[in-house]
Amino acid sequence: MAALRRLLWPPPRVSPPLCAHQPLLGPWGRPAVTTLGLPGRPFSSREDEERAVAEAAWRRRRRWGELSVAAAAGGGLVGLVCYQLYGDPRAGSPATGRPSKSAATEPEDPPRGRGMLPIPVAAAKETVAIGRTDIEDLDLYATSRERRFRLFASIECEGQLFMTPYDFILAVTTDEPKVAKTWKSLSKQELNQMLAETPPVWKGSSKLFRNLKEKGVISYTEYLFLLCILTKPHAGFRIAFNMFDTDGNEMVDKKEFLVLQEIFRKKNEKREIKGDEEKRAMLRLQLYGYHSPTNSVLKTDAEELVSRSYWDTLRRNTSQALFSDLAERADDITSLVTDTTLLVHFFGKKGKAELNFEDFYRFMDNLQTEVLEIEFLSYSNGMNTISEEDFAHILLRYTNVENTSVFLENVRYSIPEEKGITFDEFRSFFQFLNNLEDFAIALNMYNFASRSIGQDEFKRAVYVATGLKFSPHLVNTVFKIFDVDKDDQLSYKEFIGIMKDRLHRGFRGYKTVQKYPTFKSCLKKELHSR
């Protein structure tokens, strides 16, 4: 700082006083310490006044000098930071930040700072590491299901993203990952070694996903298919199997099963968020692993497909797809699709095995049971039951209920003595939710007759619609949760509307969205467009 002062303000020459009362000036213009008289002689009042004026003037000059130095240093620091972050502003046009037309003919200046380097676009069959900024950019063009899959996926192989079995369990039982996910890149050889530990379908159990943990992969279309399984009644299992079994031999082979890959892909394209085609191409590569041709069997049915669910799309279009150009391209699709845990589990390591209905039914039932067991155990703390309040909390997850405390207080005060909900009661209730549409028809009959439904009528309607018998304690607990007006009656508005949200956990999209990353990506896109 002293050296900087000398450069900015060189010390003035010391000139002799013009009169006997003018004080001498020292370095930097400060009055020199002198008595101008005999030692020990006190200054006169006039000398004291002149010295005080000179001292004040010197302090003002010093203060302004220090402020100037600080301002100059601050401006230089800001400029350095901006240069380090954004590089040389002359590299692009001032309007949009992109290269001008003349940039193609003129040689580029050498880089002058550590600006952000452009990230290369991923090509098919090429493994790249994608930064967090690119993840947020692609989220702008993804649907809610695609964003959730990418949020929980942890494996990347040749540009395509996969979930592990553990990732899938987290995606359907938690709101968001505990830590930010990073995609672990695997080679084809490493992936095949991982799939070698997949058990055959006849060795499946209700702990399959928990036993595999990180030793397996699930593609995006399989993720959608598994979500369908979680929300369908057992009666729908036979329908699903018959859709795949086009030749009627009571067996499904790998080619027949892979039809869902193309059906779900085309269904999803109807819901794509329009925008940058390059970004959409990168997103399709991540989700499906290859770019399929634009002409598709389902393209002519686009308007009708938009309003359908994935399950309806699969049910209505599987046979149509198999007897169209998809059947002719079955070998091409099989060669493009990367083997996954489900494909190896169903059809063996060589893909030659066939799947019968008994094994298919057992797999779907085991998956539903496994997810319910995980949710139940997360609240039971090793006990055989969960509290009625915890049961209410589980039912209200993934719903649009803003103030859940009202429902929880109903249980807390209406059931002061905790009896608990067993796993059998817990499982039977969620099996009932998978038959909610049939139950809603029965419940609407009471609404049309302007009748409220009581506990006995509710229990009978459940049995008629689903064949399930609820225990009196389970029925009473359900009424205490949803009977907000405390009239011991249940209405369509109090129950059916909320349970429809709960049934489609993760399938209709979660109400908790990452607002800040989406806003930041949108703002960045808007700034770059100007």
From Swiss-Prot:
Ca(2+) 2 binds at residues 483, 485, 487, 489, 494. Residues 232-267, 401-436, 470-505 form the EF-hand domain. GO terms for cellular component: mitochondrial inner membrane; mitochondrial intermembrane space; mitochondrion; uniplex complex. It is found in: Mitochondrion intermembrane space; Mitochondrion inner membrane. One of its GO terms (biological process) is mitochondrial calcium ion homeostasis. Keywords: Calcium, Disulfide bond, Membrane, Metal-binding, Mitochondrion, Mitochondrion inner membrane, Repeat, Transit peptide. Residues 92-115 are annotated as: Disordered. It comes from the Eukaryota. Residues 1-43 form a transit peptide. Ca(2+) 1 binds at residues 245, 247, 249, 251, 253, 256. SMART domains: EFh (SM00054). Specifically expressed in the central nervous system and skeletal muscle. InterPro entries: EF-hand-dom_pair, EF_Hand_1_Ca_BS, EF_hand_dom, MICU1/2/3. SUPFAM superfamilies: EF-hand. GO terms for molecular function: calcium channel regulator activity; calcium ion binding; calcium ion sensor activity; protein heterodimerization activity. Pfam families: EF-hand_7. Tissue-specific calcium sensor of the mitochondrial calcium uniporter (MCU) channel, which specifically regulates MCU channel activity in the central nervous system and skeletal muscle. Senses calcium level via its EF-hand domains: compared to MICU1 and MICU2, MICU3 has a higher affinity for calcium. MICU1 and MICU3 form a disulfide-linked heterodimer that stimulates and inhibits MCU activity, depending on the concentration of calcium. At low calcium levels, MICU1 occludes the pore of the MCU channel, preventing mitochondrial calcium uptake. Belongs to the MICU1 family. MICU3 subfamily. Heterodimer; disulfide-linked; heterodimerizes with MICU1. Component of the uniplex complex, composed of MCU, EMRE/SMDT1, MICU1 and MICU3 in a 4:4:1:1 stoichiometry. EF-hand domains 1 and 3 have high affinity for calcium and act as sensors of mitochondrial matrix calcium levels. EF-hand domain 2 is degenerate. This is Calcium uptake protein 3, mitochondrial. It comes from Homo sapiens. The lineage of its organism: Eukaryota, Metazoa, Chordata, Craniata, Vertebrata.
